[in-house]
Amino acid sequence: MFLRLIVAITATAVSLPLAPRTLSSQAAPAAAAPAANPKDVASADGIIGALYDVISGPAGQKRDWARFRSLFVSGARLVPTGLGQDRKARIRAVTPDEYAANGPRMEEAGFFEREIGRTAETFGNITHAFSAYESKHAATDEKPFARGINSIQLFNDGTRWWVVTIFWDSEREGNPIPAKYLGKPGGSGE
């Protein structure tokens, strides 16, 4: 009985037509979003590189939050995860605007995040990238203060790439970055 119900629901969902221009209307940024630099959004490599570049900079340097916002599809989310003080896993979803509102903290202390490895898979108009990163307060810092993995979901609308979500977790005791995600930055080729 349960199996028949699942099959019926799946068949119904698959047979429902998409509303006209659904993907095109979803791909457009919010009305106030700035136009993207074509180089930033021409490829999966380009948009991932732009993500790291736009949030990085020395103490006192303003970030280009208009450029940052231009990378995201309307409705995009950034989703940090981690452990609370009670050691339980936590999750919080924010919009690109909410993330940018925290920009003064990065600008105050200095913040550099760079990709240290990537695996990516593409199917049709979607790409998923596991992008390993390290974070430093200054580009010249010998050791990072944090490392982790950004799980980045991208969408290509036929004219450009968009960030749909960035979902990340930090490396910590008992949660090291697996070696298979290190050493191949910029590897999607899309």
What does each of the following model-derived ranges do?
Residues 147-176:
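Short beta-strand edge/turn micro-motifs at domain boundaries
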Residues 51, 68, 76, 129, ...:
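Hydrophobic pocket/interface hotspot
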Residues 60-65, 69-88:
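Early exported N-terminus immediately downstream of N-terminal targeting peptides
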Residues 89-92, 140-144, 172-180:
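A short, polar/proline- and glycine-enriched secondary-structure boundary/capping micro-motif
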Residues 55, 72, 133-135, 167-169:
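Short beta-strand segments enriched in hydrophobic/aromatic residues
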Residues 77-78, 82-141, 190:
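Surface-exposed, charged secondary-structure patches
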Residues 4-17:
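Bacterial N-terminal signal peptides
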Residues 23-70, 182-189:
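Short, low-complexity N-terminal intrinsically disordered segments enriched in polar/charged residues
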